[in-house]
């Protein structure tokens, strides 16, 4: 029996993964607003205590996915908490009277997709849901700038001389695992690079995985629902061919640890001059090697909150929705960096900007 026939009648689920700041949430927001009449159930796994991505999507006003259809798993990597968090959450979603037509799962930028995909073979889930496909979103501008290539070349060259350098950096492993798991790769932010840069990105991404999934280009996360949904792969049946670094380490008796990354929340008052704040924030991010920053700001005299999303020195900002009646106004930012980031120094530097 073919995979497509075996999965008839099951709810399709699309796993959307990608490195920090690749544009997953923006792409999902666009998808929800153009869902072709499908009712979408959304599970969001965020890294950090403040559920920024979930709040952004809840505020998008899409009829395809109401607030009740959005479930957040915060402050825990879904790849490490499948049994405790994901499976009970999925079961609860399936028990609803008004079940979704399609389920979208957004992993955190730190999640390994493979354990999540394997969870769809859990008996209670396998009989009800199939993985329609895994979509990996790539920050084309970051890859074009050599963010991963430099680390790979250095480690690969030194590994021959030093047995202690047998494993590549955790960031690079995440990138490669997300590519290896993909059925569709979205090269996002292609408007930020030229034709030669795009070719280099395609070559780089292709070299990172032995599998050759389809690659498409996008800007601002704009990809049609007809492209993202309905792949019909049944990825859970092919998980053995998508082995991650994580699984290979476990086979060798090693453990996976997300302590390479830290996150914390900075809470501030109002931002009187957001343009000046953003400009100075770029300096703080560059000085302290902050990987990702995201959150909201309160601007006096503005009825809407200002959404702030930073990947490296590149910062996007826009007013996303009005403050709710009785909602406490303020500025809340999630900062994500490597484990040796000086939290006290970063917190003090950001606080000093106000």
Swiss-Prot record:
Q: Name one GO cellular component term.
A: cytoplasm
EC number assigned by the record: 3.6.5.-
The UniProt annotation places GTP binding at 18-25, 80-84, 188-191
Question: Molecular function terms in GO for this entry?
Answer: ATP binding; hydrolase activity
Stored CDD domains: CobW-like (cd03112)
Top class in the EC scheme: hydrolase
Q: Which reaction does it catalyse?
A: GTP + H2O = GDP + phosphate + H(+)
Give the location of motif CXCC motif in residue numbers: 77-80
Query: In Gene Ontology terms, what is a biological process of this protein?
Result: cobalamin biosynthetic process
Instruction: Tell me which Gene3D superfamilies the record gives.
Output: CobW-like, C-terminal domain, P-loop containing nucleotide triphosphate hydrolases
Going by the UniProt record, its keywords in alphabetical order are: ATP-binding, Chaperone, Hydrolase, Nucleotide-binding
One Pfam family assigned to this protein is CobW_C
- Protein family (similarity comment): Belongs to the SIMIBI class G3E GTPase family. ZNG1 subfamily.
Write out the function statement from the record. Answer: Zinc chaperone that directly transfers zinc cofactor to target proteins, thereby activating them. Zinc is transferred from the CXCC motif in the GTPase domain to the zinc binding site in target proteins in a process requiring GTP hydrolysis.
Q: What is the name attached to this protein's record? A: Zinc chaperone CobW
Organism whose genome encodes this protein: Sinorhizobium sp
């Amino acid at each position: 029996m073919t995979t497509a026939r075996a999965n008839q009648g099951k709810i399709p689920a699309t796993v959307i993964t990608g490195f920090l700041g690749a544009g997953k949430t923006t792409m999902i927001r666009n998808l929800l607003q153009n869902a072709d009449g499908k009712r979408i159930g959304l599970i969001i796994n965020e890294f950090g205590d403040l559920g920024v991505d979930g709040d952004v999507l809840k505020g998008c006003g899409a009829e395809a996915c109401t607030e009740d259809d959005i479930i957040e798993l915060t402050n825990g990597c879904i790849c490490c908490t499948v049994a405790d968090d994901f499976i009970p959450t999925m079961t609860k979603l399936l028990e609803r009277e008004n079940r979704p037509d399609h389920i979208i799962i957004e992993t955190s930028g730190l999640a390994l997709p493979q354990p999540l995909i394997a969870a769809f073979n859990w008996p209670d889930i396998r009989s009800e849901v199939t993985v329609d496909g895994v979509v990996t979103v790539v920050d084309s501008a970051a890859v074009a700038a050599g963010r991963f290539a430099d680390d790979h070349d250095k480690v690969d060259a030194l590994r021959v001389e030093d047995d202690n350098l047998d494993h590549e950096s955790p960031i690079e492993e995440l990138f490669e695992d997300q590519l290896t798991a993909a059925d569709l790769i979205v090269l996002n932010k292609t408007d930020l690079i030229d034709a030669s840069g795009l070719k280099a990105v395609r070559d780089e991404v292709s070299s990172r995985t032995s599998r050759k999934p389809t690659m498409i280009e996008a800007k601002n996360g704009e990809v049609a629902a007809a492209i993202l949904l309905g792949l019909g792969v049944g990825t859970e049946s092919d998980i053995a061919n998508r082995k991650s670094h994580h699984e290979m380490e476990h086979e060798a008796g090693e453990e996976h640890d997300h302590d390479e990354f830290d996150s914390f929340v900075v809470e501030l008052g109002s931002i009187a001059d957001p343009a000046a704040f953003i400009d100075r924030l770029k300096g703080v991010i560059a000085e302290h090697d902050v990987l990702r920053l995201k959150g909201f700001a309160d601007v006096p005299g503005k009825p809407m909150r200002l959404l702030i999303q930073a990947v490296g020195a590149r910062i996007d900002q826009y007013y996303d929705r009005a403050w709710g009646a009785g909602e406490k106004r303020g500025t809340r930012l999630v900062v994500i960096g490597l484990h040796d980031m000086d939290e006290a120094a970063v917190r003090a530097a950001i606080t000093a900007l106000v």
